[in-house]
Amino acid sequence: MGEGAWWAVAAVVAALAVVALDAAVRAAHAWYWTASLGAGRRGRLPPGDMGWPLVGGMWAFLRAFKSGRPDSFIDSFARRFGRAGLYRAFMFSSPTIMATTPEACKQVLMDDDAFVTGWPKATVALIGPKSFVNMGYDEHRRLRKLTAAPINGFDALTSYLGFIDDTVVTTLRGWSERGGDGHFEFLTELRRMTFRIIVQIFMGGADERTAAELERTYTELNYGMRAMAIDLPGFAYHKAIRARRRLVAALQRVLDERRARGGKTAAGAAAPVDMMDRLIAVEDEGGRRLQDDEIIDVLVMYLNAGHESSGHITMWATVFLQENPEILAKAKAEQEAIMRSIPPGQKGLTLRDFRKMAYLSQVVDETLRFVNISFVSFRQATRDVFVNGYLIPKGWKVQLWYRSVHMDPQVYPDPKKFDPSRWEGPPPRAGTFLPFGLGTRLCPGNDLAKLEISVFLHHFLLGYKLTRKNPNCRVRYLPHPRPVDNCLAKITRLSSSHG
């Protein structure tokens, strides 16, 4: 046998050794987490792969999302193990069951006895231990009851609508009048606009400097939300946790100032009541008021939910409308009809006008499905539970893969096509449309978010055009889907503009 042949044999043996070592390490890691279940219960687990110790499936997860093919992660499990609906993995340093079908997601989300919130350590630390993401059922119900009406109630939305409408009109006009070549980062500026709106709603008295500081700090915090909780220089979580400390300090200063003024402005007049004032004053049935750390964590949570999703979905909806002339024309015709129905003397939009936006609502829903801002959420089993015939052991984490549901061709035919008409007819069955979750932990700011998005699209459709500088720009999927150039574009005011 020649020297070349020996080298070939050695290479094959080495490759086989690597494969054997990989299989042995994976098997040992799986045994470590499942041995205590016993043979009977272990045999009822969903199929899957626990990966290597410490990292588990995180490398494959990050590789899929950072390569621009986010669906390939769950697709790899489906190819290897079939369409089981549940898969076993090791994610975010925990043994995890991943739910990927409407039926599995619905059962987990609707069972508050068997499942509690189970977000990763990084998310809990950054949003806050006293926020919804870390609360038990009773405390969550109490806080949701205290905060829901001031966010999504009819009176609340009515009071917010005027400011949202004025802000959108002023912002669009300003963008269309920019100097130079007119290009700017559309997503970045949208996020600033939605942040101004949410700060006004929650902290109406915050000055411009404080609002700008909050926006910069929050942006740093957000990039660590889906990272592993490694608090070392160079890691996203390390930078984010430091931003969290600065954000808490800034909110505490505003809170201290509010308490000191006792509902008065600096000049001594009665101050308008905003969400922070309501959180300071609100009492539950037992007469208990919220502590400062509870108020701050609630504010951070709503800054995240109300600002991040609105900015990104508004950008993508605008892009999809501009890329689909027939859809744009239909949405524009609806908004023109609404304008013609507004009585003389009415200033701005009303909730009555908003509720006439049937087709625009379909556009927003299709954008929510297509983009998947919240691609996954987290629960933890409080006891052994069987879902789809598989065991979810007590203490294990559960990931609810909303993205897999929304991009499943068995649920949505041709899922990679942007098609608002799929929302015509009866509402989707429970578990198939999950942009805001489901059950008692449905996102409390969903109506406010849709109101913001719809008001922006209303004015954009009636008077403006978006032209992207890099229309084929690559998309980055973590922490949220966005073009790598933040949608560098210019806004042009049309001659037929109504504003």
Curated annotation (Swiss-Prot):
EC numbers, comma separated: 1.14.14.107
Main location class: endoplasmic reticulum
Keyword Transmembrane set for record: yes
Domain of life: Eukaryota
Pathway the protein contributes to: Plant hormone biosynthesis; gibberellin biosynthesis
Cofactor(s) annotated in UniProt: heme
Gene3D superfamilies: Cytochrome P450
One GO-annotated biological process of the protein: sterol metabolic process
The keyword Membrane is assigned to this record: yes
Membrane topology, from the record: Single-pass membrane protein
An annotated GO cellular component: endoplasmic reticulum membrane
Alphabetized Pfam families for the sequence: p450
Function according to Swiss-Prot or TrEMBL: Catalyzes three successive oxidations of ent-kaurenoic acid giving gibberellin 12 (GA12), a key step in gibberellins (GAs) biosynthesis. GAs, which are involved many processes, including stem elongation, play a central role in plant development.
Protein's recorded name: Ent-kaurenoic acid oxidase 1
Organism, as annotated: Hordeum vulgare
